[in-house]
Amino acid sequence: MPFVKGFEPISLRDTNLFEPIKIGNTQLAHRAVMPPLTRMRATHPGNIPNKEWAAVYYGQRAQRPGTMIITEGTFISPQAGGYDNAPGIWSDEQVAEWKNIFLAIHDCQSFAWVQLWSLGWASFPDVLARDGLRYDCASDRVYMNATLQEKAKDANNLEHSLTKDDIKQYIKDYIHAAKNSIAAGADGVEIHSANGYLLNQFLDPHSNKRTDEYGGTIENRARFTLEVVDALIETIGPERVGLRLSPYGTFNSMSGGAEPGIIAQYSYVLGELEKRAKAGKRLAFVHLVEPRVTDPSLVEGEGEYSEGTNDFAYSIWKGPIIRAGNYALHPEVVREQVKDPRTLIGYGRFFISNPDLVYRLEEGLPLNKYDRSTFYTMSAEGYTDYPTYEEAVDLGWNKN
């Protein structure tokens, strides 16, 4: 793959991106974060992180000491899953391989955070049915799309609106997964309440039609997410917990900016986090998906919601904020964003194709193009074989 054409890199060495910052108990050397990136290389059965490639992949991207690495979405339990090749962290065999991955990251003097993931209606009902599992959702009055509704009918596994007992079990599963993460050597966990997955489905009035204490009002829709937050604060400590949100996201049939109450909903969540912070329980960070990318399945520049901004979060939440969404090709925007001393920047797809991304950002070097066709394939190709800048020059990529 050649370098990205038409891109004029700018060195960010003299910006706050290369100032240290403390996240929880970890002292980062810079603020360029590797965010969660689903890669579908785990082995089935068992949802086990890939024993051959995963530690190599993460170690390559942790090569700059002091880098914050947030893992790909990781299932907290079989019931939370439904993708055969995404990893989990509920079993001893999974934990054993995560230990190797975290060791590879720590050997580079970088830091490992595990994203804890529950799919909800974004899962595959036929895969769940095969394994004797429910097709869970916030409320069964609406499906994510017609295709999944048909799959659910064909598999005789219709949507199941979580009962209060189900919610309690999910919280127990989050606790178990968080404990396993720390026991395996992770520095912390990120609760995934974004991009249309289960916790996000409770936050959004399009997917949440409940009439009990988990639906109907802003406070009720936020209840499940905040109960998970509180459970993990008590289990592993607030300094080891972060939360990811996507206020303007439309992925997996979320409302995004079309919902008039979206700012009010997320302002409430952030306000509740700040209340906990003032009581001595400040989370390590909040991670926001930008309206620059409302749907991560689209290419850069597509799907931007130009009528919204996440700037509102800064007046409510006073802790660190990771901002992610189409920043790699826009260093001039990063230069402005990181003027705020609490801001970190998440770089997704270009961290896939540039294992030495932090070095390239610092020096203002060209970026390797990524190959989207290898994002989710069971292969080392497009996973561990992207070259560093020096290797790419040796390959002649700078001449293509």
From Swiss-Prot:
Transmembrane segments: none annotated. This is NADPH dehydrogenase 3. It comes from Saccharomyces cerevisiae (strain ATCC 204508 / S288c). Belongs to the NADH:flavin oxidoreductase/NADH oxidase family. It catalyses: A + NADPH + H(+) = AH2 + NADP(+). FMN binds at T38, Q115, R244, R349. Homodimer or heterodimer with OYE2. The keyword Cell membrane does not apply. Flavin-dependent enoate reductase that catalyzes the chemo- and stereoslective hydrogenation of electron-poor alkenes. The enzyme is reduced by NADPH, and oxygen, quinones, and alpha,beta-unsaturated aldehydes and ketones can act as electron acceptors to complete catalytic turnover. The physiological oxidant remains elusive. Has a prooxidant activity, increasing reactive oxygen species (ROS) levels when overexpressed. Formation of OYE2-OYE3 heterodimers contribute to the induction of programmed cell death upon oxidative stress. Substrate binds at H192, N195, Y376. One of its GO terms (molecular function) is NADPH dehydrogenase activity. It holds the Pfam family Oxidored_FMN. It is an enzyme of class 1 (oxidoreductase). The active site is at Y197 (proton donor). Its cofactor is FMN. Its EC number is 1.6.99.1. GO terms for biological process: apoptotic process. Keywords: Flavoprotein, FMN, NADP, Oxidoreductase. The keyword Oxidoreductase applies.
